[in-house]
Amino acid sequence: MNDARKKLYISDVTLRDGSHAIRHQYSIANVKAIAAALDRAGVDSIEVAHGDGIEGSSFNYGFGAHSDVEWIEAAAASVKHAKIATLLIPGIGTIHDLRNAYDAGARVVRVATHCTEADVSRQHLEYAREIGMDPVGFLMMSHMTTPQKLAEQAKLMESYGATCVYVVDSGGALGMNDIRDRFRAFKEALKPETQTGMHAHHNLSLGVANSLVAVEEGCDRIDASLAGMGAGAGNAPLEVFIAAAERQGWHHGCDLYGLMDAADDIVRPLQDRPVRVDRETLALGYAGVYSSFLRHAERAADKYGLKTVDILVELGRRKMVGGQEDMIVDVALDLLKSAEHERTHAEPTMSEAGR
């Protein structure tokens, strides 16, 4: 259970996960303003990168307005207290890219893998520790395996040097009891000194609730973003989580009103698509789909005259995971072909029409 005297580690992800919400188009001025506001408000770390992690800028994931190094340097120059964090997905970013991020000012790295593939994080976690970074394990799509198997993967990351391992609800598909079960499994499997973290998405409107439950189960680090800025329906809104934590009497060290101002005055105006629970983002949580698929699926739906929800539900049925963004167009074409087949067979033949 949570010790109310314990200082929660507040990890902001507006400048990384939030990048998905605007197709990775943060300007340097945006980064500086957001990082400075977060630093003044007292968060512990500020994650900065392309939405898909360092070196994610590509045809497959979407090109960023700037390089990760440029974003990280801008954020690092704008803070006095908060640590700059970044995210690396093995296979997208390399240890050489991680070194570049470190030289630019990043001091925390979250090495992200699919929830059953922790073994691919070893090289990156060990290297991060070697160069003096805080190495964190990040188990994405945590709803796609059992609590016990997830804990086994967390144990692997711990053995590679991770100081903290996250339950990552990439699809926003986990319920509150699912969160309890996973953190209890972590507690049984991990060493007492290894911290745990929660990264929620708000697709079922449970981002804040799940984060609160995680803390009740002893979670040390909470991810959240200003105005919920993130993939899909967004992450747990930082200002909302802090307000709820304050009402619980928990020690978070943040300026609530400063966060509220930053969310409404700086971040929300940047959204070209509202970050909210709606028909499409709800489908992500319902079908258990990777939240960053949203904008890609919307683009495919618009191009081929389909419903975004139909594409997302089919992606969920096929159990597509992060890194398979290129398959979204294939799924759209399959749905289009199926619809044309049904339409052709539904039309009466000439002989039937003449009866």
From Swiss-Prot:
Statement: the UniProt record of this protein carries the keyword Manganese: yes
Keywords carried by this UniProt record: Aromatic hydrocarbons catabolism, Lyase, Manganese, Metal-binding
KW Secreted (keyword) present: no
Active site feature: H20
Gene3D superfamilies: 1.10.8.60, Aldolase class I
Catalyzed reactions: (S)-4-hydroxy-2-oxopentanoate = acetaldehyde + pyruvate
InterPro entries: 2-IPM_HCS-like (IPR050073), 4OH_2_O-val_aldolase (IPR017629), Aldolase_TIM (IPR013785), DmpG_comm (IPR012425), DRE_TIM_HOA (IPR035685), PYR_CT (IPR000891)
Protein's GO biological process: catabolic process; L-leucine biosynthetic process
Ligand binding (substrate): R16, D17, S170, H199, Y290
Enzyme category, top tier: lyase
Record site: Transition state stabilizer: R16
A molecular-function term among this protein's GO annotations: manganese ion binding
E.C. code: 4.1.3.39
Pfam families on file: DmpG_comm (PF07836), HMGL-like (PF00682)
UniProt signal peptide: none
Residue span(s) of domain Pyruvate carboxyltransferase: 8-260
Entry binding sites for Mn(2+): D17, H199, H201
Entry similarity comment: Belongs to the 4-hydroxy-2-oxovalerate aldolase family.
HAMAP family, sorted: HOA
NCBIfam families in UniProt: 4OH_2_O_val_ald (TIGR03217), PRK08195.1 (NF006049)
Protein name: 4-hydroxy-2-oxovalerate aldolase 1
Organism of origin: Burkholderia lata (strain ATCC 17760 / DSM 23089 / LMG 22485 / NCIMB 9086 / R18194 / 383)
